A protein has these predicted regions:
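Short, intrinsically disordered, low-complexity terminal segments
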Residues: 4-9, 44
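Short, Lys/Arg-enriched N-terminal segments with co-localized hydrophobic residues
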Residues: 9-36
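Conserved catalytic region of serine esterases and O-acyltransferases that act on ester linkages
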Residues: 35, 218, 222-225, 229-231, ...
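Conserved SGNH/GDSL esterase-like catalytic core that processes O-acyl groups on lipids
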Residues: 38-40, 46-134
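A structural signal for well-ordered alpha-helical scaffolds and beta->alpha junctions
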Residues: 47, 51, 137, 181-185, ...
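Alpha-helical cap/lid subdomain in secreted, periplasmic
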Residues: 104-228, 240, 249
């Protein structure tokens, strides 16, 4: 994917004094003009899946969107909270769906730009158990509002593991993807209420809906999204939720893995059935 290189970063620097420095990427332009939406995810590999195509899909549809994912694999809300307490420079700074090789803390990322949307999520293995969210999600939301009081905080509802997968059979206590999703949906709803979230990105519901409609493969390893249709579904879900724009005729095709016409049709139908403009 080459569209990241259409963004020219005029100022990217770390001023690191005992890991307490600042990270600044807020002077950015693109061949579409100024950035008109800035999205930051405090997440893990599931937000990585969701953001892989988001910037490029938005660009394809004529919108300049800056996306940043703070990545630690399998990162729990409790780990995010502990990293906040120590201002740990522990996160891979993923910019517009690509790795950068830069490490940052949550604070450094928060102050690096005037974010429009900041997303929070739980690690997938605990996503159906609300007791694992609290009190960490509340503390993280409070910290986010301290540094970015005008940003919208949104919950990223993640998805269930695939039926028949080792992940579902051995890692969690559910017997079916539908059972896992029901627990996930309830837990994220409680989390959104607890932090007075500005909204929810319904990736989990879009994923299970697409699977019901016959999407295969939706996962690549039983739990992460497939590199083609799965990640495309997530990008469309985020794009429509964040912008309200119509996706019915979307023709984005810069994928890491082939997306067939049949898969595209299912993905668009599923997202449209879940996300109402």
């Amino acid at each position: 994917m080459g569209c990241i290189f259409s963004a020219i970063v005029f100022c990217v620097k770390i001023l690191d004094k005992s890991n307490k420095g600042t990270y600044n990427t807020n002077i950015i332009t693109s061949n579409l003009g100024v950035i008109i939406m800035k999205v930051l995810s405090i997440g893990n590999s599931f937000s990585q899946d969701a953001q892989r195509y988001l910037h490029c899909l938005a660009k394809h549809n004529g919108m300049a969107m800056k996306t940043v994912n703070l990545y630690i694999p399998s990162c729990h809300l409790q780990t995010h909270y502990l990293n906040i307490l120590d201002d740990n420079v522990a996160y891979d700074f993923e910019f517009n769906g690509e790795s950068t090789g830069i490490k940052v803390s949550i604070r450094q990322a928060l102050v690096s730009d005037d974010w429009d949307v900041i997303t929070l999520q739980q690690v997938s293995g605990c996503s159906g158990k609300y007791e694992t969210y609290t009190p960490f999600v509340e503390a993280i939301a409070e910290y986010v509002r301290k540094y970015r009081p005008h940003a919208k905080i949104m919950i990223h509802q993640t998805w269930a593991y695939a039926d028949g997968s080792e992940a579902l059979d051995k890692w969690v206590e559910y017997t079916t993807a539908e059972e896992m999703f029901a627990a996930i949906s309830d837990a994220y709803a409680q989390a959104a209420s607890a932090i007075n979230a500005d909204g929810m990105i319904l990736s989990g519901e879009a994923m299970i809906t697409a699977i019901r409609m016959g999407l295969q493969p939706a996962h690549r390893d039983g739990f992460h999204a497939s590199l083609g249709a799965g990640r495309y579904l997530l990008a469309l879900c985020w794009y429509k939720t964040l912008t309200g724009k119509d996706i019915s005729s979307d023709s984005f095709d810069d994928f890491d893995e082939l997306v067939t016409d049949e898969q595209r049709a299912i993905v668009i139908k599923a997202v449209n059935s879940v996300v109402k403009a």
